[in-house]
Amino acid sequence: MVLFGAGTWGGAITYFLNDIVWDYVVDNRRHAEFLNGYKISSLDEIEDKRACYYVVSVLFKWRQIEKQLKDMGIPSENILLLGKIAEEKQYFDLPYLKFGKDEVFIDAGGYNGDTAKRFIEVTNGMYDSIYILEPNKILATECREKVNERNCYVVEKGAWNESTKLAFDMADASSTILVSADEVIETISIDELLDGKRATYIKMDIEGAEYKALLGAEQTIRKYKPKLAISVYHNRCDIWEIPKLVLSYNSDYKLYFRTYSFTGNDTIMYAI
C-alpha cells in the first residue's frame, strides 16, 4: 500500500494511524528523506506500480495526482483520494437538508459543473431548474458539457450585488474578483437573474465575493427563504458577517456550520 503525499497530512496519517504499515511513502517533491520513520520515495522507485493501492493524502491538488496515476495505468479502484471524499460531501450531506421535486438551484461559482451534477444525482433528476453562474469562460464551457440536462442554464457571469464589470483573476477553482487582475468579467445579482422568480436552494463558493453576492440576493431570500449553502472561510470576517446578514433578511433561519477539510478551509454555513 502506497501513501502518496509526504506533506502535512501525510505526516498526520502516518503519525496518528500508526497501526497501518505502508510499503511506500511517495511524493513528487521530496523536502526530506524520511517521514515519521518512512523513507520518502519517488514513484519511479516502485517496481510494480499497477499492483499497488494508493491513498492520496493531498487535499488541494488531488486531481493532478489522480491524472498522474491514471496516466501510468493505475486503475481507478486502486486509488483512494481523501480530498475528493471530503469535497463530494459538500453542500448535500447535512441531514436537515431536504429536497422536493420542484427545486430551483442557484449554483454561484459553478466551477466545472461538478456541484450541479451532484445536485441532479441527489434529487434523482426531479427538479425545476438549475442556474450555474461561472464567469471563467473555459470552466463555463465545461459546465455546459458536463451538465447538459433539461432546464439547466449556464450564465457566464459572476454573482455580485449589481450588474457591472469587474477585474477577475482566472485561476480555475480559485478564480477571484479583484481590484486589478488579468480579465474583465460581467456580473449580475441573483435578484436580477431571477427577476422575481423563486429559488429554493442557493449555493455560493465564489472566493470571497459571497457577502456582495448575498447583498444582491436580498429580495429573493426575504421573499422565498431558500435553503442556503454559503462558503464562510475566504475572508476573516465572513464567519460572523455572513450569518448576521442572512439573519437580518430572515430571522427564522436556522444556521449550521460544516468544515470539509482538515485545514479549516471549505467551511460552509447552511441556512434552513
Question: How would you name each of these model-derived features?
Answer:
Residues M1-I20, N28-I272:
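Phosphate/nucleotide-binding beta-alpha loop and adjacent structural elements of enzyme active sites
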